[in-house]
């Protein structure tokens, strides 16, 4: 009789142990301390780089020399886009034209700090080599003549009437061109208060070698 009781008790204990094991196996496992839930990290937005004209001019001059050791500049201009309105003498896009007298050709170089898809890639790039016309030689100038930067030209133009235009339109776009003027025999910054050189509210002409204000126009 005692043997039967012990058998019943032992069977009951084994049944309880088996049930406990089954419950433990079927319950959801918790995440171990070593397992980490993957998290998504936001990629930081790449900001555009705004350059002054002289900064880009130096970069483009170096690239032009690799193309042709005798390459000399004969024109540079800024461009407008959603990243820069040209104020303070800075832009994300500058284009320079360099000619090789021995090749009698020129190339357009672009200095870009833009992040826009429809603009030139970041850095300095160049276009195709093209034969230049008879007017180009008279426009060529030596790179060392550029002393006053575009931000200085902007500040000078502001003092001579540009600030009044800014009061009327704080987002006033500003464009810059750099050219040798055979008549003045000087390298000139021309500051255009407008969205294009043909349609501007005011123009300031500054000597790019001395920084001196020369004249205003419309």
Please give the residue ranges for each predicted region.
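Bacterial N-terminal signal peptides that target proteins for export
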Residues: 2-13
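Long, terminal "pre-/pro-" and other extracytoplasmic accessory regions
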Residues: 6-8, 20-218
């Amino acid at each position: 009789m005692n043997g039967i009781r012990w058998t019943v008790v032992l069977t009951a204990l084994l049944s309880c142990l088996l049930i406990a094991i089954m419950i433990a196996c079927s319950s959801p496992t918790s995440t171990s301390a070593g397992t980490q839930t993957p998290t998504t990290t936001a990629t930081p937005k790449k900001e555009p780089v705004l350059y002054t004209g002289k900064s880009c001019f130096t970069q483009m001059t170096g690239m032009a020399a690799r193309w042709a050791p005798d390459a000399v500049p004969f024109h540079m201009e800024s461009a407008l886009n959603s990243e820069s309105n040209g104020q303070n003498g800075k832009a994300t896009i500058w284009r320079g034209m360099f000619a090789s007298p021995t090749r009698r050709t020129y190339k357009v170089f672009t200095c870009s700090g833009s992040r826009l898809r429809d603009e030139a890639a970041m850095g300095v790039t160049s276009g195709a080599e093209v034969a230049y016309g008879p007017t180009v030689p008279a426009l060529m100038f030596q790179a060392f003549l550029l002393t006053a930067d575009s931000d200085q030209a902007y500040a000078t133009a502001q003092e001579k009437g540009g600030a009044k235009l800014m009061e009327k339109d704080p987002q006033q776009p500003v464009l810059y061109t750099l050219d040798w003027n055979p008549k003045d025999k000087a390298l000139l910054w021309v500051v255009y208060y407008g969205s294009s050189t043909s349609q501007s509210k005011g123009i300031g002409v500054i000597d790019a070698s001395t920084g001196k204000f020369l004249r205003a126009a419309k």
